[in-house]
Amino acid sequence: MKTRLFTIFLFIFSFSLVFAGGSKEADNSRNNEVVIYAYDSFCSEWGPGPAIVKAFEEKTGYKVTMISAGDAAQVLSKATFEKANPKSDVLIGIDNNLLDKAKSQNILESYKPQNADALIDSNLILDSEWFLSPFDWSSFAMIFDSYANVPAPTCLSDLTKDIYKKKIILMDPRTSTPGLGFVAWTLAEYGLDGIEDFWKALKPNILTMAPGWDTGYGLFTSGEAPLVISYTTSPAYHIYDGEDYRYVALEFEKGHPMQIEGAGLVKNAKNPEGGKAFLDFLISKEAQEIIPETQW
């Protein structure tokens, strides 16, 4: 598994994301404040973050500062840049494809939340050391706009056909976990011998490589292209929101790898006890009941 993930990062090509440092630390203690770095859609007004934070604050008395740091890979990069003087207590969104990179940067502290054995299915546990606590999961899928004037593809190789020229929206695998997940999907299907040829054939059909899911999916629903990488659960949002069945999660014969999103305690966090309390709450029934209707 580690070899495959290393290969994925090599395929993407080496890079360094540099973020400006966070706001000046006002107080070294801040015992009552929990600082969380999370990805854009988690923090948005329609995402689960605001409701989870509100419920946590009301239950525990902690004050939460939730900072949107881009997509999940950017959350990881920001925390890595600050690791000599961490400004966050909890990172949200580091997934199974980013776990090894996060561990190699030594930015996470092992912590197993209270009641984890009772609340978390053993199949979802990301690592035995509990550097990450799983809180959300779904399988990747291509989402298709059924109103489009092109037929729905039935497999990954179909995506390389001329009929889909400039009709596919993907996410940058350097900054986006869906983008990285799609690369992992193609590697699993084509292997090292075939992945380069697949991507060369796919390139003319890519409208854009968006920096994150939020931007990419927004372009898709704006009608910029009829295909986007997302999750099997994405169409349910539109139905829940009172829309019709326009958007369809395509079921291919192979693939659809699962993404398991985790949250972790930052190593040398300024408020580790507050961070632990938040992780305890994030896997609780109260928090988990918020996620299905806010995290699609």
Can you say where each PLM-predicted feature lies in the sequence?
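Short, polar/charged alpha-helical segment
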Residues: 35-65
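Short, low-complexity disordered leader/linker segments with a strong preference
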Residues: 1-34
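A bilobed periplasmic-binding-protein/Venus flytrap-type ligand-binding module shared by bacterial periplasmic
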Residues: 141-148, 259-274, 290-291
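Periplasmic-binding protein-like
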Residues: 138, 166-175, 199-203, 209-210, 242-267, 281-296
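A ligand-binding cleft/hinge motif common to bilobed small-molecule-binding domains
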Residues: 97-101, 221, 225-246, 295
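Short amphipathic alpha-helical coupling segments at ligand-binding clamshell hinges
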Residues: 52, 155, 194-198, 270-282, ...
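Extracytoplasmic ligand-binding site segments that recognize negatively charged/polar headgroups
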Residues: 37-49, 70-74, 86-225
